[in-house]
Every structure is written in structure tokens, then in C-alpha cells.
Amino acid sequence: MTLWVLKIGTSLLRGTEKLSTKKIIHNYCSCIAESKARGDQHIIVSSGAVGLGCIQLGFKDRPNNINDLQAAASVGQVHLMDLYQEYMATFGYKVAQILITRSDFSSRNCYRNASMTLKRLLDWGVLPIVNENDAIANEELLYGDNDTLSALVSTAINADQLVLLTDIDRLYSTDPKVSNEAKPITDVLNPNQLKDIESTIQKPTNWGTGGIKTKLVAARIATESGIKVHLADGRKPETLSNILQGSRGGTVFHPSPKPIGNRKSWLAHALDPAGAIEVDEGACKAIQNNGASLLLVGIRQIHGEFTANQPVKLINSKGKELARGISSLSSDSLGNSINNPTNNKNSPVVIHRDVLVLTSDLFT
């Protein structure tokens, strides 16, 4: 049995002259039904609510205003789920809708609840359809066509494989639409190779922002948790069927042989640091070399404002990020305490090692 997360991009659900949106979704549902009959489990992370909403509302152009996009998404999401429900029902399966925002993952309890809900639905043989809650998410919460969301879902439920279905056949060394020198990349074998590829995606083109760049981020999040990732051309009906039967996508990102684990992945990727804590050299060495917790005595300076139990970055005197974790004290409390000589003795723990992840453990 293989647990799959399948991310279907917006561009794939718009429909073409040859294939309507309904036919496209029917094809995907057919592939999934065949795979489920073999004993596999699946979660779909589906974009497309805004686009379908615009079609339902008769808009000629996609709105630019965030409120218009949210309203269009609320219309489109209903239609999107109707299609998935209709076609999976023809194969004898039920579907469930899961709408998520970034704030849902920032709470460890909500993160666990989402994971348990998804696992229970899978146990019942239901196909969960996950989407970002576009109707209420604001600009700071948008995941980027659900690429990052699909990786976070994959790590939350310990998926075996993540398939990123998109409108390109594979990863290239540069944008093949603008360069004749673009070379296909069929395998990304290790974190250093992935890091090198990410560093080359710099220019603000469709290839570099919100397109392939977010897919590379998703691949990094998933592979460092031990999940195999396929980047594949979802425009071809046979692509998904072949992958679910054991073939490979156009580009395969191979999983880390030393996964960081669910909790560390959550700390590193599901949370947005609210501030930063600058630590001294002794604390740097203790945390990096000995796996120690951060004590109050090792703090030099506080950057930004945060409350107790919020995520923060740990940085050295040069501003380089060393780790991320959950601070047990607020920035105000820390600011009042770090210069108090009485705290040098029996120094309290500010970030326990159980809620701290080293940057060196990640592919960043």
C-alpha cells in the first residue's frame, strides 16, 4: 500500500479546446479509482477554486483585488467539489472537503487535528480533497498555488510519495520557453543538488516566481522528510495513471536517507518566525554541537516582538540563522531579563531542545 498526495495545479483545471474541466477531473478520478482498487490511499491537494469561480460568474479576466479573488473562490470551491464528488461517486467512492489556511498549521494542536482527520478519512476509504481556504486567507497566508500546502500535508500524514502535476513535462536548468540551452533534469539526487538548482532560480519570470520556484520549495520540504517527489506533466491523461502504477514522473526528487521527522518539519516549515533571538558564541556551540536547549544566559539581544509560545529564529552576532524554535517567554520578558545578573545562576530554559530545529538539519 502506498500513501499518495496528488497536487493538481490551477492551469490543469482551466480546460482546453480538446478537454473540458469536467473531462480533466473525470480522468484524474478514474486514475485514482484504479489505484484505490489496488489498495493504495490518496489525498488530492487541488487548486482551481478561483478560476472556476470566475467562469461561473462570467468574468472575462481574473480579478486582481484580493477581496474579489476571495469571493470568486467561494463560488468556485462549491463547483470544484461537486465535480470531484460526482465523478468519484461513479467509481463507488466518497470525497471529503478539507479547507486549510497557514494559521491552521501554525498551531501544533490544529496541525495534529488536521493530520488525525485526514488519516481517519483514509481509514474509511474516503478521498480527502484539500485546498487552501481562499475565501478567508489574506495575502500573507497564500501558499502559492498550493505547492507548499501539498508538501505540508504530505509531511503531516507521513505520505510515501508526492506528485506535483503541472503544465510542464519536467524540471529544466532554465526556462525552456525563453532559452534554447535549457537542459532537462530527470533526477535530483541529494540536497546539495536541489540547493544549487534553487539558487539559479532568481530572475522574476514565470519560471522563477510562483511557478517552478514554489515547486522546488515543496520538493525540499517533502524530501527532507523522506518523501519521494515527482514533478510531472498533468496535461497528459496517462501521466498520473503511469506514476500510480510505479512509473516515474518527468523529474524525480529523491528522499533524504536521514529524514528530519514530523515535529522538526513542522517547526521548520509550518511556522512563520515572529522575531529573532541573537545568541552568544557559547550558546551557538552548545546548541549546534551538543543538541542543548537555549538558556537565558546565552542570549545577547532580542529582535522584533513576539509573545510566549511563538516561533522565533536563533541567529548569531552576524545575523546568520542557526535554528528555529518555540520561545517559552515573550520578547518583553526576555528584554527585561537578559541584563539582570541574577539570571546568570539557574538560568531558565527559553527554548527547549524538543521544540528546536537546527538550520543545518535542513536543506536550506
From Swiss-Prot:
Superkingdom of the organism of origin: Bacteria
SMART domains, sorted: PUA (SM00359)
One GO-annotated biological process of the protein: L-proline biosynthetic process
The protein's enzyme class: transferase
Pathway membership, UniProt: Amino-acid biosynthesis; L-proline biosynthesis; L-glutamate 5-semialdehyde from L-glutamate: step 1/2
Localization in the cell: Cytoplasm
Keywords per UniProt: Amino-acid biosynthesis, ATP-binding, Cytoplasm, Kinase, Nucleotide-binding, Proline biosynthesis, Transferase
Keyword hit for Kinase: yes
Binding site for substrate: S47, D134, N146
UniProt KW Ubl conjugation keyword: no
GO molecular function: ATP binding; glutamate 5-kinase activity; RNA binding
A Pfam match: PUA
Biological function: Catalyzes the transfer of a phosphate group to glutamate to form L-glutamate 5-phosphate.
Protein's name in the database: Glutamate 5-kinase
